[in-house]
Amino acid sequence: MSGLEPTPEQFAALAARPADAPVVMVNLLKFHPESGLQRYQQYGRDVAPHLERVGATVRYAGGAPSVVIGEGERPWWDAILIVEYPSPQAFIDMVTNQEYLEVHEHRAAALDRGDLISTSSWSIAPE
């Protein structure tokens, strides 16, 4: 089962990434059965100014109703949220800000499970 907070090792690995490269965070979200979605939507509204403050952009947010390739009819997660930050430090600055930590309580209360995957982009265009 996934934790809802990063381990010190996970946080250190993110901080060690190239400082001048954007980082795209893929959130796989499993909501608590009772009011989890509504609480997460409240978190989304409350976190928007914090994302703006660090220059982050929501690239995609949506449900995960079915599996096309893979096992089972549905994935384990209910929704996907993809957010691009201008750098790893921008993400770190946001999540360590005291005002953000107050908003973060809504996220923790909404989720039964939440995997956060830090990715880097690469081109698939032909050379």
Task: Please report, for each region that a protein language model flagged, where it lies by residue.
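Hydrophobic alpha-helical segments of small multi-pass membrane proteins
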Residues: 80-83, 99
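Secondary-structure boundary/capping signal
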Residues: 55-58, 99, 115
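Charge-dense polyanion-binding interfaces
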Residues: 105-127
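Short S/T/G/P-rich N-terminal loop/turn motif that feeds into the first structured element of a domain
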Residues: 1-79, 86-93, 120-127
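Short amphipathic alpha-helices in soluble, non-transmembrane regions
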Residues: 93-99
